[in-house]
């Protein structure tokens, strides 16, 4: 299953690993292990954040994917199922069924 692995590095840890030169080498090493489809890095809420897209074959991979970030950076790690455009197209029948089954009637708007 395609997943977004979101990694948030605390400012203090990020600063320390930049100062000692280990941040880029460690990230490169972790990414070499997890073999992502894509990896992007940006600021989110004032912290260094990685958005890493990868194919997770089974949930038992979660510790192997998360632990390097915990151990190297004291990072916060989140996993989110993700879809590409083809996946989204395939999901259309399920969405249509949900709309028919669960959509609430429109409520009149107040004047």
Predicted regions and their residues:
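Conserved, structured core segments of small domains
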Residues: 1-111
């Amino acid at each position: 299953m395609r997943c977004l692995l979101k990694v948030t590095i605390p400012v203090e840890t990020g600063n320390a690993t930049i100062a000692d030169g280990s941040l880029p080498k460690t990230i490169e090493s972790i990414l070499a292990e997890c073999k992502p489809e894509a990896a992007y890095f940006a600021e989110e809420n004032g912290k260094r954040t990685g958005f890493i897209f990868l194919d997770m074959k089974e949930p038992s991979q979660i510790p192997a994917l998360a632990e390097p970030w915990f151990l190297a950076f004291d990072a916060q790690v989140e996993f989110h199922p993700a879809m590409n455009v083809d996946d989204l197209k395939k999901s259309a029948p399920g969405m249509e069924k949900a709309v028919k089954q669960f959509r609430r009637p429109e409520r009149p708007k107040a004047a």
